[in-house]
């Protein structure tokens, strides 16, 4: 895990809120028409609506979180769904405990 990229991704309050929201997506984001949020993840449009962000800003934020390895993207047709990468988040927490 690249700690610097992870910290940069989490330094933005909206990205941090998105990652926190993905921990309990059913409570944090509006219901979506397709897919199970626990299995498939949360659609970008639901994240956008739940956060009150533009589509382009939401896509950019999710790209940053994805490059940092904190979320996993799954493409289904024209939709992209995101879930937390729990393994990477645990590695980040462990690294904070040992490296800082």
Task: Describe the role of every protein-language-model region.
Residues 1-7:
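Short, Lys/Arg-enriched N-terminal segment that forms or immediately precedes the first helix
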Residues 8, 14-54, 80-87:
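N-terminal helix-turn-helix DNA-binding core of bacterial DNA-binding proteins
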Residues 49, 60, 66-67:
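Alpha-helical residues within the helix-turn-helix
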Residues 59-61, 78:
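Base-recognition residues in the alpha-helical recognition helix of bacterial helix-turn-helix
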Residues 67-76, 83:
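Beta-hairpin "wing" of winged helix-turn-helix
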Residues 88-92:
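Short, charged/polar, Gly/Pro-enriched secondary-structure boundary elements
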Residues 95-96:
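Residue-level signal for well-ordered alpha-helical positions
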């Amino acid at each position: 895990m690249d700690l610097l990229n992870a910290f940069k991704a989490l330094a933005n309050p909206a990205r941090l809120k998105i990652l926190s929201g993905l921990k309990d997506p059913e409570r944090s984001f509006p219901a979506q028409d397709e897919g199970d949020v626990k299995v498939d993840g949360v659609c970008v449009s639901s994240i956008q609506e739940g956060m009150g962000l533009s589509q382009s800003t939401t896509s950019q934020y999710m790209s940053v979180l994805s490059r940092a390895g904190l979320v996993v993207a799954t493409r289904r047709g024209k939709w992209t769904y995101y879930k937390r990468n729990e393994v990477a988040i645990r590695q980040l927490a462990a690294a904070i405990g040992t490296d800082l």
